[in-house]
Amino acid sequence: MDAAGKDSAIEHVMTGVNPQGVQVVGFRSPSPEELDHDFLWRISKALPERGRIGIFNRSHYEEVVALRVHPEWLERQKLPSAPRGPALWEERYEDINAFERHLDRNGTKIVKFFLHVSKTVQKERFLARLDQPGKEWKFNAADVDERALWDEYMSAFESALTATSTPWAPWHVIPADHKWLTQALIVRILVDAIQALDLSWPEVTEQDRQANLEARKRLELEP
């Protein structure tokens, strides 16, 4: 959702994490190249390597939310003639669930957050952007047009979250009216998820250990 605090959550939650192990990708409107592929292609391209943390600011869920509110945008996607209507969204839910299941089976832990800001607070944040010179650049007049479709978006979000919250990739709906609370809840969930991975330091082989002992002796013999 616009003005839900996605950028600030990423900034504050990841403070202190070694940036060498993190990548952040923001998804906007698909490029002409991306429109020449299926809707999950650009997501696959942006996935992190094993051992790294990947953060998606927006994602493939735009394809079952924004496009459901604006079905006319589908015309740019060069889709087959069928299916359209409700069947299309059901098929995309299936595709997303299968895609995320595939990632989970291959070692990618998926944690999904929906930052749920109220309509009142969204309005306050839009006005605050307009009032502050350092934030006005973040305001987009088109966001007000989308705000007029609030009920349609809420319906699309509800359908998508219900259909795609799975044991391997559950949704976490986070209240987003108070940023400190939003960020604290995200941190708690991420800490629990990382601890559940039961990570450990890389094992040192016996051969490496012997080489390390020899290196230690050489260091200790140095004047």
Predicted regions and their residues:
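Glycine-rich phosphate-binding loop of ATP-dependent small-molecule kinases
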Residues: 1-223
